[in-house]
Swiss-Prot record:
Main localization of the protein described in the UniProt heading: membrane
Subcellular location: Cell membrane
Stretches that traverse the bilayer: 4-24, 35-55, 59-79
Name of the molecule in the record: UPF0316 protein DSY1893
Organism: Desulfitobacterium hafniense (strain Y51)
Alphabetical keyword list: Cell membrane, Membrane, Transmembrane, Transmembrane helix
Family named by the database record: Belongs to the UPF0316 family.
Entry keyword Cell membrane: yes
Length: 174
């Protein structure tokens, strides 16, 4: 029984590691970090081949197959949590506030965020509309700053795949 449990734990560990790396590699590719994704794939495929050979040599036990499946699920979850912590890339926030908060754009610029603003028209009157570009790892900071200055702001976050130009582009890209 001890060797079965030990074998199951090895399979789970290998699969968690493999799938976590796969998830991170996939996200790196989406973010345009092809070199890092390529380097990571070497380690990923090595671990995959090790795990696959172990499971194929031991298909006689349902515990091994269950361990493989459980490791896969945990690996996806763990990989997505790691990516969330890394917060790679940029976010674009569309912020809409009542016009009395016109100073918000200047406050956000002073905090190092890229802001373009213009006047818009809402259902109940004029609104200040802002597009705010920030690194994704500053998203919580941006939202906290907006909330502290204007708690009833309407905010939508998006992830731009590419952008170019603008006075702030050199600062953002490097």
């Amino acid at each position: 029984m001890g060797s079965i449990l030990q074998f199951v734990l090895i399979i789970i560990t290998i699969n968690i590691t493999y799938v976590t790396l796969t998830t991170i590699r996939f996200i790196l590719m989406i973010k345009g970090m092809r070199v890092y994704a390529s380097l990571l794939s070497v380690l990923e495929v090595f671990i995959y081949i090790m795990g696959l050979s172990i499971i194929l040599d031991n298909l006689d036990s349902y515990w091994n197959i269950a361990a493989y499946c459980c490791g896969y699920g945990v690996g996806v979850y763990l990989g997505s949590r790691i990516e969330e912590r890394l917060a790679l890339g940029y976010i674009m926030a569309q912020v809409i506030v009542e016009c009395e908060y016109q100073g918000l754009a200047g406050e956000l610029r002073d905090a190092g965020f890229g802001v373009t603003s213009w006047l818009g028209e809402g259902k109940t009157g004029p609104r200040m509309v802002m597009m705010v570009l920030a690194k994704r790892n500053r998203q919580k900071e941006l939202l906290n700053r907006i909330d502290s200055l204007c708690s009833n702001a309407f905010v939508i976050f998006e992830e731009p795949k590419n952008f170019r130009g603008g006075f702030w582009a050199k600062k953002v890209l490097h």
